[in-house]
């Protein structure tokens, strides 16, 4: 086995004048771009990355992304730009889906939120605005961090002009309005929409929507046709609730919002959802939170949780943004059991729920000799959380005391500002909500958990707000020759030298890339300047370990046997942190509080068929099912309005099925083989269902030790499936209690084998090798393009929104 991996080789001279950290392994002339993985990779590229001007050439993507990022700092030289371009073009530096999608020469003039994967927020208007910008958002719902009583909000009235294209006048538009407002059962057809039902919809419309603003003392707010306008509307309501202005009336006019279906320029022309979507969200807030809080005893944290849910539903239903959320709550809160049961009771499906815990919590759980009231509370929390998680996978546990900013105390150094600067950029400025932000910032200084995580768990962020500025590097794809042509663990010395240098340079280039992104105009500009936080991490680790070092998953769990691999990982971590510190110093910015992470890497990894982040391959071979509009009639013909791709795929031999649970929709199955299955591993491939939970926890501990490191580290995002046909609830609890205290975070997801889940179909269906071969033999296709839908991008590592 060739295990040499040198930290300092080449490119280390000439630092006295202008420091050049690179080994120039990527060269300073353009290199050919790596083709995307056939099938899934190409489909994801078309769905999320390519623009018409890219002509489906990843090299053109690399050109614009490198140019846009380099434009953030005038001192970036041409040589670095070309090396950055080549690292991206080869796939060695994948950055993130956000950069690949949005990066171009306009980046210096755009807002940072379009380029950040995730964030945190301390109040609902901030969370909503970030979601509208495409961020996933985490929020802490600790009692000490929830202060707004939505029962004290003003009375809300809604206006939509009769002249607006989306105002319903005729029967067809009234039917659509009734369906969108959920007055009518989904799927109600035109022929069933009789005069009586139409009258019900008209009555609802007259009760809830005014055609013009009333005259009088009411406060009128015209909602602007922009993300900023929608965010400001919620800010106005939330700020008035914080001030206790229940006796006032706020009139919200939706008439300036563009009609549904209009293109959104900043989202590659994707269709706008129109005013009815926001109207529906605010109606739900009025009825299910404001009025409910006035009528009953709804705690403040639950009010906030429900407001955030109803607003994020509208972001997700719009279809152009993902609306991923993380909701956390301290185990110490007296009402945490209600939070734990919230998902079990149904309805709150837009957020992943986790309980923030610490070493004291685990001591109480694991030491039954302790019998004080807090110990009893901890054990009750653990028992109830694991009972609920055993049923639906939530809540999880996050070890808040192990998160970097809490561990070091840096989170408590954040200053409190009363002028709204904590949420201010050129595009959006918090005005009405400034006092609320200041109040919450002051509370956070003494909060037990001043930091939380983003929805995927890989970045530590202050509870009052911060960003995930993150990117992936793929060490396998830094190989200067086709990995399939390399004998695993026996890499020729010349090839190994270039390969290793490229890996090192991809880390250096990636760190600098992310630190430049921190220079963008940002809502959380104060926090970005304070922390200069980034997160760079590897993806395709299992493929790299196999081809470069000849090691499979179980080899990696043996530190002695896998020493060459783990030494390489540790040295890359050192490079990342050293380069981050040096580049921050050179550019006059703060030393980054965090540098290393491992993110889920779903989109970026799929482009090239890699295992995602730290995850094991989910399956050896599978059918990827994608929904299309249209069904076949009994006579064998396709219904009018059927997507023309459906009959095309069927003629080519792809499996096609009509759905019962989604009327009017059919699915097409695309045979998929991950890259790791094409590298000669054979039976040495270990899939996630084949690895024991203890093995996977050990893998996470090693990644935290060697890559995350003792300082300047975030977390490893990881979903560990525990199959309920192999483990009982008691063994599940024992496994969590024994292992979860020793990692920063890990999503443990009880599940059943695909065949036992009871769904009509799953986005990815594992099939036997024989069945897979039979299916592929039936397909005659050299031309038809595959597609991908949101289900596959959101199911990156097994956490599916089903």
Where are the regions that the model predicts?
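Extended catalytic cores of very large enzyme megasubunits
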Residues: 1-802
């Amino acid at each position: 086995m060739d295990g040499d991996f040198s930290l300092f080789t080449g490119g280390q001279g000439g630092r006295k004048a202008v420091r050049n950290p690179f080994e120039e392994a990527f060269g300073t002339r353009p290199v050919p771009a790596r083709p995307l993985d056939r099938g899934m990779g190409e489909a994801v590229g078309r769905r999320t990355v390519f623009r018409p001007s890219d002509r489906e050439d990843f090299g053109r993507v690399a050109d614009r992304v490198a140019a846009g990022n380099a434009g953030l700092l005038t001192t970036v030289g041409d040589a670095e730009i070309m090396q950055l371009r080549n690292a991206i073009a080869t796939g060695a530096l994948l950055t993130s889906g956000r950069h690949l999608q949005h990066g171009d020469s306009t980046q210096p003039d755009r807002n940072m939120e379009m380029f950040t994967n995730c964030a945190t927020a301390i109040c609902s208007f901030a969370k909503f605005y970030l979601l509208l910008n495409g961020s996933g958002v985490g929020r802490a719902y600790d009692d000490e961090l929830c202060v707004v009583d939505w029962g004290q909000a003003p009375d809300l009235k809604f206006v939509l002009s009769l002249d607006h294209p989306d105002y319903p006048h005729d029967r067809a538009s009234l039917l659509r309005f009734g369906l969108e407002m959920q007055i009518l059962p989904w799927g109600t057809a035109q022929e069933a929409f009789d005069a009586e039902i139409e009258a019900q919809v008209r009555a609802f419309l007259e009760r809830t929507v005014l055609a013009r603003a009333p005259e009088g003392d009411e406060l009128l707010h015209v909602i602007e046709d922009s993300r900023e306008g929608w965010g400001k509307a919620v800010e106005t309501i939330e700020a008035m609730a914080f001030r206790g202005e229940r006796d006032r009336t706020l009139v919200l006019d939706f008439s300036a919002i563009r009609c549904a279906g209009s293109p959104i320029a900043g989202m590659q022309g994707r269709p706008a959802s129109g005013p009815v979507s926001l109207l529906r969200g605010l109606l739900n807030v009025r009825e299910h939170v404001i009025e409910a809080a006035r009528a009953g005893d709804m705690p403040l944290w639950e009010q906030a949780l429900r407001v955030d849910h109803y607003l994020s539903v509208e972001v997700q239903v719009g279809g152009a943004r993902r609306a991923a959320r993380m909701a956390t709550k301290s185990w110490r809160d007296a009402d945490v059991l209600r939070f734990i049961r919230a998902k079990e009771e149904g309805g709150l499906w837009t957020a992943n729920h986790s309980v923030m815990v610490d070493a004291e919590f685990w001591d109480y759980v694991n030491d039954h000799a302790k019998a004080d009231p807090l110990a009893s509370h901890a054990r009750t929390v653990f028992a109830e959380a694991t009972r609920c998680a055993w049923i639906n996978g939530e809540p999880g546990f996050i070890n808040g005391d192990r998160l970097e900013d809490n561990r070091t105390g840096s989170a408590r150094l954040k200053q409190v500002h009363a002028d709204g600067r904590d949420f201010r950029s050129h595009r959006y400025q918090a005005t009405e909500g400034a006092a609320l932000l200041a109040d919450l910032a002051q509370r956070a200084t003494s909060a037990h958990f001043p930091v939380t995580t983003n929805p995927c768990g890989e970045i530590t962020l202050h509870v009052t707000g911060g960003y995930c500025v993150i990117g992936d590097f793929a060490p396998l794809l830094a190989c200067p020759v086709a990995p399939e042509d390399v004998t695993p663990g026996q890499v020729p010395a010349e090839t190994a030298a270039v390969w290793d240098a490229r890996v090192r340079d991809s880390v250096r280039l990636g760190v600098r890339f992310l630190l430049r992104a921190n220079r963008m105009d940002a809502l959380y500009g104060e926090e970005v300047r304070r922390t200069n936080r980034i997160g760079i991490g590897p993806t395709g680790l299992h493929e790299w370990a196999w081809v470069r070092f000849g090691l499979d998953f179980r080899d990696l769990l043996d530190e002695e046997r896998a020493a060459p691999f783990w030494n390489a990982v540790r040295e890359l971590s050192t490079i990342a942190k050293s380069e981050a510190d040096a580049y921050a110093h050179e550019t006059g910015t703060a030393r980054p509080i965090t540098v290393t992470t491992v993110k889920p890497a779903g989109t970026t990894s799929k482009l090239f068929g890699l295992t995602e982040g730290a995850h094991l391959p989910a399956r050896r071979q599978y059918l990827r099912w994608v929904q299309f509009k249209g069904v076949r009639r009994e006579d064998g013909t396709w219904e009018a309005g059927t997507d023309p791709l459906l009959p095309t795929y069927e003629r080519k031999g792809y499996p096609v099925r009509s759905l019962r649970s989604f009327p009017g929709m059919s699915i097409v199955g695309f045979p998929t083989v991950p890259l790791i299955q094409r590298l000669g591993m054979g039976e040495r491939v270990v899939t996630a269902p084949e690895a024991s939970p203890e093995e996977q926890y050990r893998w996470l501990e090693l990644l935290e030790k060697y890559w995350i490191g003792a300082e300047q580290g975030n977390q490893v995002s990881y979903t560990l499936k525990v199959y309920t046909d192999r483990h009982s609830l008691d063994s599940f609890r024992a496994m969590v209690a024994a292992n979860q205290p020793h990692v920063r975070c890990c999503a443990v997801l009880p599940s059943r084998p695909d065949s036992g889940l009871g769904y009509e179909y799953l986005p990815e269906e594992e099939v036997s090798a024989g069945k897979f071969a039979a299916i592929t033999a039936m397909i005659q296709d050299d031309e038809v393009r595959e597609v991908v839908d949101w289900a596959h991008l959101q199911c990156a590592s097994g956490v599916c929104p089903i």
